Amino acid sequence: MELKGVHQQNGTSNGTGAVGAEGESAPPTAPATAEAAASLETTTEKVDAEQQKPERTNWGNGLEFLMSCISVSVGLGNVWRFPFTAYENGGGAFLIPYIIVLFLIGKPMYYLEMIMGQFTSQGTVKIWSVVPGFVGVGYGQAFATICIITYYSSLLALTLYYLFVSFQSVLPWSYCWEEWMNCVDSRPQEDTDALLLSSSNVTNVTALTDTVKLQSSSELYFLNVVIKEKMDISDGIGDPDWKLTLALFVSWVVIFLVIMRGVKSSGKAAYFLALFPYVVLFILLVRAVTLEGARDGIIFFLEPQWGELLNPTVWKNAVVQCFFSLAVGSGPIIMFASYNRFDHGIYRDAMIVTTLDTLTSLLGGITIFAILGNLAHNLQIENIRDVVRSGTGLAFISYPDAISKFQAVPQLFSVLFFFMLFVLGIGSIVALQSTIVTILCDQFKSWKYWKVALATSICGFLMGLVYVTPGGQWILTLVDFYGGTYVVFILAIFELAGIVWIYGMQNFCDDVEFMCNRRVSLYWRVCWSFFTPVMMIVIFIYSMVTIEPITYSEQFFPEAGNVAGWLLFGIGAAQFPLWWMWYISQHREGSLGQSFVASLRPSDKWGPANPETKRQWVIFKNEKAAQRATKKQSSKLGAFWQKLGHFCGSNT
């Protein structure tokens, strides 16, 4: 039986039959009962008041949405973070827990967030009309998103700085400066005659070899020239560097220009933000695999350390990387999907993005470790582990060091590499920043989108200044650990629990069937209701039990830093109970216990945003409920006659 008019959005309708995940037709719906009619009448009165609401802007076409999801999910996490994470957690063996985590946590969470955004046409806060008491999940995710935005933008500033200086005739990090007495050139050995070093300085460096640890010019350039690193922040973090401040400002100008008109502007930019990095990545891949030593680097990356599979930390890091890479749990996926038409085919998009994300991570890892293999070959270092650095050091020390050793036009490859990183970073921050702007515009309908985008961009720039100080990398490490990773993780657990355990798996699956015209397969049901939440809870508990004080450059943070970090985590995590208590205090229904129970029931605002679609949804839900009631009654009646038959048979 067709569900005519079910998918009406923006004045159009899609009256296709409900088709299962394996192509089977949905069961025929029973006629609407009197109870359903009464419910429909009540809902009609409620949605009539919504008729005057301005309709939500939609993507220009479905491809813009797909490109936007690719631009945020296929980002810095694939090229910068994944290779090092894989290398640290068993190399090729890490791919096994990562792929398992992807299928049991990553894909289910990604698809669920797409569904929630598209079904409600609301951002990460407003979707919680499904379980109003859980609105703090949305606000907590917004807090974590703000934390991530601030330090992500500082990485953009560093990338832009390196991009600008890459246009010089000689890469500035490729040679030693006179004051660096413990320096070794990053340029190829045959180019040393072109270095701006005096013979006395070279002699001094040679004399120091046995007593002082030598450092590459790329490392000293990053630490002493670019970030002017402080090794101790007990006396403060210092003042912002003017060059990095300028780069930070330019980065935020670009971000604002991309998001100023919402999806109308960011959707067009998404084509470039999503596709251009692949062009550069393939160019770098072709160049990288032809370098001497590239094979050793790739083998080092892919060679499995099977013993690591039994290490719980590896599984924890696989989950963290999956969240970081796919951008789930922080709001962008919900936000992007909220601008879709109600009947958009998100199942296909979710599968494309999550698969492409994994393939890109592998591609990025092979490319990067091929380059690092060449670096080890040029330095005559057998263990590639000795040339690999973590964190920002991987992007701004190891990579530049390797690129400076390219024999042919290293400036070109440097420009391509850092421009690719800049584009990847812009794609990620555009999504994160748009999430915050959408939350504010959903809450305050009269606010102009571009004004909110401008105000939040200014705030983002001002907050980002703390990271371009000499002690900025300390703050980045602290905020990422306490304000980003763990806050996102614990709130993602509550997000999943609120939808599938409190709202209910059956209710949620009915909503998906209504919107997508396809039944929810057993795989999704089992993951959402059991595997995904249980695995996340176990891993979070393990992380909390085994947590250790964080370090930067092998140095522990001062006590005040750890206190500030836990305070940051507390602010993010506390959004959940605080907003729950606030909701109960503002919506009292009888006793405290009754108000508590009421906070777990969907509010009148829950459902499709389009009034006509909402009417059809209520009819569909009531028909589904009637079908289940009839089936249950028939089942009981059948059991009764079966027992009666057995009884009569036993007495004859």
Curated annotation (Swiss-Prot):
- Chain ranges sitting on the Cytoplasmic side read 1-58
Q: Where is this region: Disordered?
A: 1-54
The family database entries (InterPro entries) matched by this protein are listed as:
Na/ntran_symport (IPR000175), SNS_sf (IPR037272)
Which residue windows are transmembrane per the record? Answer: 59-79, 92-112, 130-150, 155-175, 240-260, 269-289, 318-338, 352-372, 412-432, 458-478, 485-505, 527-547, 564-584
Any GO BP: D-amino acid transport
Q: Which GO terms describe its cellular component?
A: plasma membrane
The record's SUPFAM superfamilies line, in alphabetical order, gives:
SNF-like (SSF161070)
Query: From the Swiss-Prot or TrEMBL record, what is one GO molecular function term?
Result: neutral L-amino acid transmembrane transporter activity
How the protein sits in the membrane? Multi-pass membrane protein
Instruction: From the Swiss-Prot or TrEMBL record, state where the protein is found.
Output: Membrane
Q: Where are glycans found on this sequence?
A: N201, N204
Primary role: Unusual broad substrate spectrum amino acid:sodium cotransporter that promotes absorption of the D isomers of essential amino acids. Neutral amino acids are the preferred substrates, especially methionine and phenylalanine.
Please report the name of this protein according to its UniProt entry. Sodium-dependent nutrient amino acid transporter 1
**Taxonomic lineage of the native organism:** Eukaryota, Metazoa, Ecdysozoa, Arthropoda, Hexapoda
